[in-house]
């Protein structure tokens, strides 16, 4: 009997951003990633999701191993997984909401007893939560750059770390929220960038030294 492989993915939406004053879309409950939401203002909200060509390429690579069943990782994923009953899930889904989003699909697979590729929910969640990941490194004695977590603009104003500093969203990946303005050489720049990131991404901001422990970055 051929192996049944579930391909879990997020398909990047293709739609223009709303014009100024446009009404805000509600979160989708229809099970389609094409239902965009604009209540989160970050310009790169769907940056981690994959283009159709990428998903097609992954499916082609998996076909020699068995039957491939596409399982888009949206609201009805649990129902689709139960119906498809794959032997294994090849997971490239990123999720959308919260610091645990990359662990949602593996957690559902575990709950339903379906083996899956890559890391488990705990590993994915810890890795995406940058301050927690750095705390784990510190606990285990692994060198990591000094850092602080800014939850408010006041935290940035009171930051005691020496400049220059690097500021980025604490729960993002794929370079989301990172730009030339992330490197802050003065407190004024840091406060401005932290204020922007807090209002845009609505999550804490990781502020870290640009020097590693005992190592100069070049």
Show the residue positions of the predicted features.
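Conserved N-proximal alpha/beta basic substrate-recognition cap immediately N-terminal to
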Residues: 32-146
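Glycine-rich, phosphate-binding/catalytic loops in enzymes
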Residues: 23-25, 105-108, 183
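Short glycine-rich anion-binding loops that position phosphate/pyrophosphate groups of nucleotides
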Residues: 10-13, 94-96, 170-172, 212-213
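Short acidic/His/Gly/Ser-rich catalytic and metal-binding motifs that mark active-site loops
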Residues: 14-19, 173-176, 216-217
């Amino acid at each position: 009997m051929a192996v049944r492989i579930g391909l879990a993915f997020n398909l990047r939406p293709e739609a223009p951003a709303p014009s100024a004053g446009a009404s805000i879309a509600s979160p989708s409950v229809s099970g389609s990633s094409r239902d965009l939401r604009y209540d989160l203002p970050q310009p790169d909200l769907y940056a981690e999701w994959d283009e159709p060509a990428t998903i097609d390429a992954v499916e082609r690579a998996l076909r020699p191993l068995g039957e491939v069943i596409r399982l888009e990782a949206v609201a009805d994923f649990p129902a689709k997984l139960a119906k498809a009953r794959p032997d294994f899930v090849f997971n490239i889904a990123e999720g959308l909401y919260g610091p645990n989003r990359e662990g949602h699909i593996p957690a559902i697979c575990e709950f339903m007893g379906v083996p899956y590729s890559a890391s488990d929910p705990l590993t994915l969640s810890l890795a995406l939560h940058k301050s927690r990941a750095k705390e784990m490194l510190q606990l285990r004695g692994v060198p990591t750059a000094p850092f602080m977590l800014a939850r408010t603009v006041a935290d940035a104003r009171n930051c005691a770390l020496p400049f220059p500093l690097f500021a980025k969203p604490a729960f993002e990946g794929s370079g989301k929220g990172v730009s030339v303005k992330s490197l802050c050489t003065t407190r004024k720049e840091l406060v401005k960038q932290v204020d922007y990131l807090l209002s845009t991404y609505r999550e804490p901001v990781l502020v870290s030294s640009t020097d590693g422990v005992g190592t100069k970055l070049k």
